[in-house]
Swiss-Prot record:
The name this protein goes by in its record: C4-dicarboxylate transport protein
Keyword Transmembrane: yes
One Pfam family of this chain: SDF
Compartments where located: Cell inner membrane
BP-aspect Gene Ontology terms: L-aspartate transmembrane transport
Length: 441
């Protein structure tokens, strides 16, 4: 009975799919690369649902608030937390890369590097300033924001719409109820889509190994090893300390979201687990309004794994090219990254684009050095995405506790003995509850 239950669990299925993808990509590279549409298709299916779910969650959460000032407080606390923690991520990346020096001794001449492959990234890096990013949050069309999957634009519209419904009083209640019912249906649909997660993870992993090969990692293994180690240190030390002060264990939280982490590992996209993550955070005891505001905002402003990557990659390039940087120059890089990492948020390939934008503003490090890490960037994206997911999970729980919007007893109970995900969806229709339970558990 236990083996049957394990066999049917999403956790087990995704692990098996990832292993099969690695084996296919390694032994049959051509067949592995042909599996790319499976991974792309799954990610597109999930992204199709993200903006409607964010809209429903935020609207219902805000419209149900009695104190409208709470929205501003939650947003302000979230942004403050994001800035502090991403700064710590940048600093810990700086410390580790200076201690381990993965690029030392490579003695690369920037003039010999092929910059053709990075041209599209450096071009995009110059296209969007911080001002452009802020203006981009305001959509030209609400329909366009939903159609193009612009999370921050949808979040802005959702906040305004939720405020409006709240101000309407009783006359706005039917609309709120309709949006809440739509939310239940959307989560049920996500349950159906998540049945395909093993297929998506298999396709994405088979493509990655088939195209780049395991052997391609050896030349830059030092940087990759240093980066993965730093991500673990950040989760264990920085996020672990934060969660300890808040009264719970980071490792119990990681275990609680293990299915979401495996989906992210297989697809290299932290967005692929966003709908399930939002449902689980509500189940964990966080109020819907806090989840709806913090999680979507965090996906643009609280990218801890990306922050670690940016610092380490920039200093690695300098080390590889034999460039000695002073402490002032390294701190300047961190200051620039605090700005540029926000300016490129939400852009496809944002990590590489942000790095290009940063190097363009720091004359001491050649932009051509990006060509050094282009080949292994795909292999480091898994650690970036996993760390981003854990970071945003912690951020939501911490902000909820800070705002007294967290049921601590429920948090402790769920971390000790997690219940099926459907319980966190608060689905009122009995037939829908059964359907969601079958598809999400």
């Amino acid at each position: 009975m236990q083996s049957r239950k394990l066999y049917k669990s999403l956790y087990f299925q995704v692990i098996v799919a990832i292993i099969c993808g690695v084996l296919l990509g390694h032994f049959m590279p051509d067949s592995g690369t042909a599996m790319k549409p499976l991974g792309d298709g799954f990610i597109k299916l999930v992204k199709m649902m993200i903006t409607p779910i964010i809209f429903c969650t935020v609207v219902v959460g805000i419209a149900g608030m009695e104190d409208m000032k709470k929205v501003g407080r939650v947003g302000g606390k979230a942004l403050l937390y994001f800035e502090v923690v991403t700064t710590l991520a940048l600093i810990i990346g700086l410390v580790v890369v200076n201690v381990l020096k993965p690029g030392a001794g490579m003695n690369v001449d920037p003039a010999t590097l092929d910059t053709g492959a990075i041209a599209k990234y450096t071009a995009k890096a110059g296209e969007q300033s911080v001002v452009d990013f802020v203006l981009h949050i305001i959509p030209n069309s609400v329909v366009g924001a939903f159609a193009e999957g612009e999370i921050l634009q949808v979040l802005l519209f959702s906040v305004l719409f939720g405020f409006a419904l709240s101000m309407m009083g009783q006359s706005g209640k039917p609309v709120v109820k309709l949006v809440e019912d739509i939310s239940h249906a959307l989560f049920a649909a996500i349950g159906f889509i998540m049945k395909l997660a093993p297929i998506g993870a298999f396709g994405a992993m088979a493509f990655t190994i088939g195209k780049y090969g395991v052997s391609s990692l050896s030349s830059l293994a030092a940087l990759m090893g240093s980066f993965y180690l730093t991500c673990l240190l950040f989760i264990g030390l920085v996020l672990g300390t934060i969660t300890r002060f808040c009264g719970f264990s980071i490792w119990k939280l990681v275990r609680y979201i293990k299915e979401e982490l495996l989906i992210v590992l297989g697809t290299s996209s932290s967005e692929s687990a966003l709908p399930r993550l939002m449902a689980k955070l509500e189940q964990l005891g966080c109020q819907k309004s806090v989840v709806g505001l913090v999680v979507p905002t965090g996906y643009s402003f609280n990218l801890d794994g990306t922050s670690i990557y940016l610092t380490m990659a920039a200093i690695f390039i300098a080390q590889a090219c034999g460039i000695e940087l002073t402490l002032t120059q390294e701190l300047t890089i961190i200051g620039v990254l605090l700005l540029t990492s926000k300016g490129a948020a939400g852009v496809t390939g944002s990590g590489f684009i942000t790095l290009a934008a940063t190097l363009a503003t720091v004359p001491d490090i050649p932009v051509a050095g990006l060509a050094l890490i282009l080949g292994i960037d795909r292999f480091m994206s898994e650690a970036r995405a996993l760390t981003n997911l854990v970071g945003n999970t912690v951020a939501t729980v911490v902000v909820a506790k800070w705002e007294n919007a967290l049921d601590s007893d429920k948090l402790a109970a769920e971390l000790h003995n997690p219940t099926p995900l459907a319980h966190g969806l608060k689905v009122e229709a009995p037939h829908l509850t059964r359907e969601v339970s079958r598809t999400l558990s």
